[in-house]
């Protein structure tokens, strides 16, 4: 007989109520094992264990067991001991242990049976000798075992000698049955406190009343019960209907040959009943029809207990006195494989038979009298049901109707937090919630990094993370600027310090030989003789005065040959001199990795590929040496999302195991860990810079698994967005996409053969290449302007250009005039904004290709590109710009007033995948301009308006409400309409323009949500030529990237020029030289692009209205004074951003610029009832500041900055609701009492239940609590 498991124990047992059940066994009373040992043990077994000979947990007990039962909630195991004790046990799955909870000795002698109530987990019944039956309350008896007294069921109708079987009614919690050594069974009612029914049976064969030793209740019918006789003369199973208790309803007496010892009625199918007895057999019955279904092979001794697994009824176990507990399945039936095996066995030789006969087990199958499928294998009617996407679909039993329901299942709730974060592009609530339920310390560090990124932006974060620990760059730069004259005087003093005087003469042949070479002008010989005589310093001075580069190189080589192996500084000098960092990356101590990263930044300012390669190589080395967080920072700087994913994927199993230890099931642990991974990856990819394709199969598999989990909650929109971010040529992605579309009630879009492409989905634009020159469609002239007043094709903004170069993919560009906005692949989506009333007059052959400087310190700035005619030969728009070549991006002066509709079915000039690597050097310009560097003050950036895109352009889905995109658009030309550019990431620290006093007031209810702009400019107030061509760019705030360039063209007369430009915010870029006409050349310097080409300065007409821009410092302190009622009918001049965007409406400054750097200036405006919160937090911060070690000064400074954000919100009354303010009052009160753990509970409550209000200040409160607790003593 094939067995699923076999445990070599002579023991009674009980099943757990799990889907994958465990089995607990206890040495049965009255037996001695093969070693004649009388030891007793309670053991826990797993059906999935690799070694079935060893239990997963064991506990020695001082007495043997008569019975065991496991509570329905799996918390308590009750044991009936032979010494008269009732003992309770608990299991601990974390460390696989069994522990004794309590022991009771209320029975006068041996306890024979125990049974937990089916309806109330805390109620237990026990029976023993002398007719003793006790009712136990687990809640009370475990609290005070020594003082607890169990209840009795009441008065019995007749005396009972021994109670050996108990069974609770499955429908009524107060009714149970008992049976024993007497010739009757009793039905008890605890409410009536007495025996209410007396069952007895007289055999028709012998005329003698039979002993009813076993009792079992019907699983669904409260009036039906089964009893079994223990007599060997007439073994029978009796089915009773208590409404007629005089005569059994059914009698099953054609199976067992001897007395019956055990019954079990299947709880999942009332048509199945198991029995076992002293004839060593187990029988399966249909008690409803009184049919014997199967007889299982006989065992070697009595089978005294058999039970179905409660939650896996296909399995059952049988305990016998043959020293075995066997676990079998109802499906153990004869099949064709058994017949083939029998034929093979008969063909083996006699030698093989006798060699193997002692090792082979019996594979006897059960005898089947009537084949009956359990109800859980199929429906009795032709109905069917299935589930997908959170919906359960059922065909009604009559087959004529359909029922669709949305069941609420624990663990399959919709991820509303992630969906909302993608919609609002505000990940702070998600981060705050994750920070209070981190899995381990490493996971907490990752979320702290994301929280820091969300507050500072990528550029500011990297600037701080890659700076030296003692590098106060801002203070040093200011001090250097103030003392610049003193520095020049210092070097002048050094230069003039030596004054030759007095007589001297040349001594020795060496000096004379070298001097002769010098005075003769033979510099090479002088250097040669100096080096041959080990006069290295003299050789260096001689070479410095020479213009011969080879000579200088030879002297440096001599220096490195002598000192390179002796001095660490020489190694640094060698790498800097050779402009190679391989030696530093491979050999410099990893603890000094910041020296290497600085060298990489400075030596490869323009070679992005080489710089990123070295940063990744350094990150790999840091990761190998245990510097995990530092390696993540370098991968972020290099834009290597794949490297970050590889680290997190390798840690996934460990995080899953840690969740399992928190008493979570395997599924719960896996789904929670998967959701956390996707959320962490999504948030991180929002800040990473670079363009990449998802090729990691393991990462794709995780996303598909999460998509499947998301669809299980019915959130098809979120699932569709993530599917759109995956490679479209992946077969599994295609299958899942089709499945989700059909389940959501949509169909796959028809692919137009004329416009189909083979491009892969990327973290940026995954569907179409917007940079390919477009050929006109035959039969449709490219210069024809077609009035378009209808809805745009495929959701595009009317009149938007389809040929804009994409900006850097992971960090949003400041502005762009292209209709498509690309960010990080998993960045939040772009939202549609209201179209501007301005209409651009432009020829259909023109293209707007304006680039905004990426706000990443390692990304190069971009240059606007010129137009290209669609009728010309297709050009590579990514090829390096040659001197004299026109710059793309200018507007044609001849244009129509109405934007043209894109031609239909135009043929692309080239396929996108052929153009993937054609952009090397497109940003390189030949002209070098060096000017005196100076430090510029940073200004604030407000997010511009948002564009609608037909497809998600980043790794993060484009819109939480989007569905499957239509087929790719044809590369047809279209006129450019003045639409708002895509938004900046609102946390990126990039410069913006200061709004004039006439800017309308923007009302923001949540400072952490993207501001909504509804500003409309009147038609005709601005010349479209000025809007498109006379745009200037603000220098990027990136300290390492070259600043953006300005495109210049002559404005049309009568046009309104843009507002004056603010100063460049690049601390390393030189100051732009002001020209007489008010324009300036772009700054250049050691950290800028050496190949930048500058244009003639623009000439603007004098603005008719509007004051000059206010400095950001004044704006921060006097923000209210520059706000204006938007209802006034004023005409607003256009506001320019750092990229050519003609109609960029003014936006409010970022939160960081609005928060006053002095908290004292805002305290007087805070409401009186909230002032104590501010006062205490200030005082507590002042208290801990001198007590905090110097190495934690950065954390203290960060805490101060975050608390000022909180004070700002309390002053403005714009973010925090009253419940959150009440929580802050409670938190402050607890901190005053030094109850920091309780204060952290309040913090967790805010992060969990008020995450939208937590923003960036909540981490500051948490940090202050931690510092205050650490400095308490």
Curated annotation (Swiss-Prot):
Residues annotated with Phosphothreonine modification: 1050
Record bears the keyword Transmembrane helix: no
Broad class of the protein's primary localization: membrane
Membrane association type: Peripheral membrane protein
Region described as Disordered: 815-835, 933-1162
Pfam family, one: SRA1
Keywords recorded for this protein, A-Z: Cytoplasmic vesicle, Endoplasmic reticulum, ER-Golgi transport, Membrane, Phosphoprotein, Protein transport, Repeat, Transport, WD repeat
Signal peptide, first to last residue: none
GO molecular function: structural molecule activity
TM regions (residue ranges): none
Record's GO cellular component terms: COPII vesicle coat; endoplasmic reticulum; endoplasmic reticulum exit site; endoplasmic reticulum membrane; mating projection tip
Composition skew (Polar residues), residue ranges: 994-1039, 1071-1094, 1118-1129
Residues with the Phosphoserine modification: 349, 836, 974, 977, 980, 988, 992, 999, 1053
InterPro entries linked: Sec16_Sec23-bd, Sec31, SEC31-like, SRA1/Sec31, WD40/YVTN_repeat-like_dom_sf, WD40_repeat_CS, WD40_repeat_dom_sf, WD40_rpt
Protein location: Cytoplasmic vesicle, COPII-coated vesicle membrane; Endoplasmic reticulum membrane
WD repeat ranges, renumbered to this chain: 6-46, 60-99, 106-146, 158-198, 207-250, 255-295, 298-338, 385-405
Superkingdom of origin organism: Eukaryota
Compositional bias ranges of the Low complexity kind: 1130-1154
Biological process according to GO: COPII-coated vesicle budding; COPII-coated vesicle cargo loading; endoplasmic reticulum organization; positive regulation of ER to Golgi vesicle-mediated transport; positive regulation of protein exit from endoplasmic reticulum; protein transport
Coiled-coil segments on the chain, per record: none
Biased composition (Pro residues): 1095-1110
Family: Belongs to the WD repeat SEC31 family.
Quaternary structure, from the entry: The COPII coat is composed of at least 5 proteins: the SEC23/24 complex, the SEC13/31 complex, and the protein SAR1. SEC13 and SEC31 make a 2:2 tetramer that forms the edge element of the COPII outer coat. The tetramer self-assembles in multiple copies to form the complete polyhedral cage. Interacts (via WD 8) with SEC13. Interacts with EMP24, ERV25, SEC16 and SHR3.
Role summary: Component of the coat protein complex II (COPII) which promotes the formation of transport vesicles from the endoplasmic reticulum (ER). The coat has two main functions, the physical deformation of the endoplasmic reticulum membrane into vesicles and the selection of cargo molecules.
Comment field (misc): Present with 1840 molecules/cell in log phase SD medium.
Name assigned to this protein: Protein transport protein SEC31
Organism the protein comes from: Saccharomyces cerevisiae (strain ATCC 204508 / S288c) (Baker's yeast)
């Amino acid at each position: 007989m094939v067995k699923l498991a076999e445990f070599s124990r002579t023991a009674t047992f009980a099943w757990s109520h799990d889907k994958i059940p465990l089995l607990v066994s206890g040495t049965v009373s009255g037996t001695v094992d093969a070693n004649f040992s009388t030891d007793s043990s309670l053991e826990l077994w797993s059906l999935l264990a690799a070694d079935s000979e060893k239990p997963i947990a064991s506990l020695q007990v001082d007495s043997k067991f008569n019975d065991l039962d496991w509570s329905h909630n799996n918390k308590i195991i009750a044991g009936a001991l032979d010494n008269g004790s009732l003992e309770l046990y608990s299991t601990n799955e974390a460390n696989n242990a069994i522990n004794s909870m309590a022991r009771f000795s209320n029975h006068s002698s041996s306890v024979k049976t125990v049974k937990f109530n089916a309806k109330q987990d805390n109620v237990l019944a026990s029976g023993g000798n002398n007719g003793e039956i006790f009712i136990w309350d687990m809640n009370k008896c475990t609290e005070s075992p020594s003082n607890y007294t169990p209840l009795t069921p009441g008065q019995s109708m007749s005396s009972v000698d021994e109670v050996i079987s108990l069974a609770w009614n499955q429908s009524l919690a107060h009714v149970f049955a008992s049976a024993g050594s007497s010739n009757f069974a009793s039905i008890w009612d605890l409410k009536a406190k007495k025996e209410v029914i007396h069952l007895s049976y007289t055999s028709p064969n012998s005329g003698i009343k039979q002993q009813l030793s076993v009792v079992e209740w019907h699983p669904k019918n409260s009036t039906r019960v089964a009893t079994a006789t223990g007599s060997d003369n007439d073994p029978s199973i009796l089915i009773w209907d208590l409404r007629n208790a005089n005569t059994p309803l059914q009698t099953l007496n054609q199976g067992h040959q001897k007395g019956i010892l055990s019954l079990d009625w299947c709880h999942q199918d009332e048509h199945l009943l198991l029995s076992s007895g002293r004839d060593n057999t187990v029988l399966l019955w249909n008690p409803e029809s009184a049919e014997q279904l199967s007889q299982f092979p006989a065992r070697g001794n009595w089978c005294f207990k058999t039970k179905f697994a409660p939650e896996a009824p296909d399995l059952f176990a049988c305990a016998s006195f043959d020293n075995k507990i066997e676990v079998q399945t109802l499906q153990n039936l004869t099949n064709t494989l058994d017949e083939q095996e029998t034929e093979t066995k008969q063909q083996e030789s006699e030698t093989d038979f006798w060699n193997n006969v002692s090792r082979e087990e019996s594979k006897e199958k059960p005898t089947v009298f009537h084949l009956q499928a359990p109800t859980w294998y199929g429906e009795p009617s032709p109905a069917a049901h299935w589930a997908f996407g959170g919906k359960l679909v059922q065909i009604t039993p009559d087959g004529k109707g359909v029922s669709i329901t949305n069941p609420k299942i624990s663990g399959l709730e919709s991820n509303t937090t992630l969906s909302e974060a993608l919609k609002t592009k505000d990940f702070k609530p998600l981060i705050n919630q994750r920070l209070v339920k981190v899995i381990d310390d490493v996971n907490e560090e990752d979320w702290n990094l994301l929280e820091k990124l969300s507050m500072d932006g990528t550029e500011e974060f990297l600037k701080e993370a890659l700076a030296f620990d003692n590098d106060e760059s801002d203070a040093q730069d200011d001090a250097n600027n103030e003392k610049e004259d003193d520095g020049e005087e210092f070097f002048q003093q050094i230069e003039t310090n030596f004054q030759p005087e007095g007589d001297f003469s040349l001594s020795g042949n060496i000096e004379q030989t070298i001097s002769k070479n010098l005075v003769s002008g033979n510099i090479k010989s002088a250097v040669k003789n100096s080096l041959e005589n080990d006069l290295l310093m003299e050789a260096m001075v001689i070479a410095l005065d020479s213009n011969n580069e080879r000579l200088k190189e030879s002297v440096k080589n001599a220096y490195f040959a002598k000192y390179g192996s002796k001095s660490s500084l020489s190694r640094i000098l060698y790498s800097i001199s050779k402009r190679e960092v391989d030696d530093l990356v491979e050999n410099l101590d990893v603890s000094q990795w910041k020296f290497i990263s600085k060298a990489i930044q400075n030596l490869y300012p323009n070679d992005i590929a080489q710089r990123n390669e070295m940063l990744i190589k350094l990150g790999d080395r840091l990761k190998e040496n245990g510097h995990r967080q530092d390696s993540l920072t370098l991968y972020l700087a290099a834009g290597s999302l794949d490297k970050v994913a590889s680290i997190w994927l390798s840690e996934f199993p460990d995080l899953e195991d840690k969740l399992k230890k928190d008493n979570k099931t395997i599924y719960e642990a896996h789904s929670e860990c998967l959701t956390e991974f996707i959320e962490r990856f999504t948030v991180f990819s929002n800040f990473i810079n670079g363009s990449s394709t998802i090729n990691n199969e393991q990462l794709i598999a995780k996303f598909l698994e999460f998509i499947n989990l998301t669809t299980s909650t019915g959130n098809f929109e979120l699932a569709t967005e993530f599917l759109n971010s995956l490679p479209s040529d992946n077969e599994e992605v295609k299958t899942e996409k089709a499945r989700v579309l059909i389940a959501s009630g949509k169909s796959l879009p028809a692919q137009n053969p004329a416009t189909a492409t083979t491009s892969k989905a990327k973290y940026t634009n995954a569907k179409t290449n917007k940079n390919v020159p477009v050929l006109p469609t035959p039969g449709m002239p490219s210069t024809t302007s077609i009035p378009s007043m209808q809805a745009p094709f495929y959701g595009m903004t009317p009149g938007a250009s389809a040929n804009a170069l994409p900006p850097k993919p992971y960090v949003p560009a400041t502005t762009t005039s292209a209709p498509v906005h690309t960010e990080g692949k998993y960045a939040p989506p772009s939202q549609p904004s209201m179209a501007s009333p301005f209409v651009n007059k432009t020829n259909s052959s023109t293209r707007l290709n304006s680039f905004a400087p990426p706000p990443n310190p390692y990304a190069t700035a971009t240059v606007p590109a010129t137009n290209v005619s669609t009728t010309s030969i297709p050009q590579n728009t990514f090829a390096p710009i040659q001197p004299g070549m026109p710059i793309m991006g200018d507007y044609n002066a001849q244009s129509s007033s109405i934007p043209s509709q894109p031609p239909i079915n135009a043929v692309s000039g080239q396929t996108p995948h052929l153009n993937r690597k054609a952009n090397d050097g497109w940003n390189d310009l030949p002209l070098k301009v060096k000017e005196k560097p100076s430090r510029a003050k940073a200004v604030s950036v407000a997010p511009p308006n948002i564009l609608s895109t037909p497809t998600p352009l980043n790794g993060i889905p484009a819109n939480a409400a989007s569905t499957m995109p239509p087929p790719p658009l044809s590369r047809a030309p279209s006129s450019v309409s003045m639409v708002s550019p895509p938004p900046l990431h609102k946390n990126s620290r990039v410069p913006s323009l200061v709004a004039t006093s006439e800017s309308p007031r923007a009302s923001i209810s949540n400072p952490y949500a993207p501001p909504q702009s509804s500003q409309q400019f009147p038609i005709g107030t601005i010349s479209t030529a000025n809007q498109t061509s006379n745009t200037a760019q603000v220098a990027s705030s990136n300290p390492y990237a070259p600043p953006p360039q300005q495109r210049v063209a002559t404005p049309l007369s009568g046009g309104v020029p843009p507002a004056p430009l603010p100063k460049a915010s690049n601390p390393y870029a030189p100051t732009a030289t002001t020209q007489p006409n008010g324009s300036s050349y772009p700054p250049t310097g050691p950290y800028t692009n050496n190949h930048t080409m500058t244009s003639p300065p623009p000439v603007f007409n004098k603005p008719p209205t509007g004051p000059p821009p206010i400095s950001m410092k004044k704006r921060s302190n006097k923000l209210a004074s520059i706000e204006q009622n938007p209802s006034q009918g004023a005409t607003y001049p256009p506001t320019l951003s750092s990229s050519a965007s003609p109609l960029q409406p003014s936006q409010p400054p970022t939160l960081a610029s609005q928060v006053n750097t002095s908290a004292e200036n805002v305290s007087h405006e805070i409401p009186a009832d909230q002032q104590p919160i501010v006062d205490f937090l200030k005082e507590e911060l002042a208290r801990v500041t001198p007590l905090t070690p110097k190495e934690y000064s950065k954390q203290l400074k960060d805490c101060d900055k975050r608390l000022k954000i909180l004070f700002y919100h309390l002053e403005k009354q714009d973010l925090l609701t009253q419940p959150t303010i009440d929580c802050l009052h409670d938190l402050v009160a607890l901190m005053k009492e030094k109850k920091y753990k309780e204060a952290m509970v309040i913090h967790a409550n805010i992060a969990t239940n008020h995450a939208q209000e937590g923003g960036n200040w909540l981490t500051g409160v948490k940090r202050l609590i931690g510092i205050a607790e650490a400095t308490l003593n």
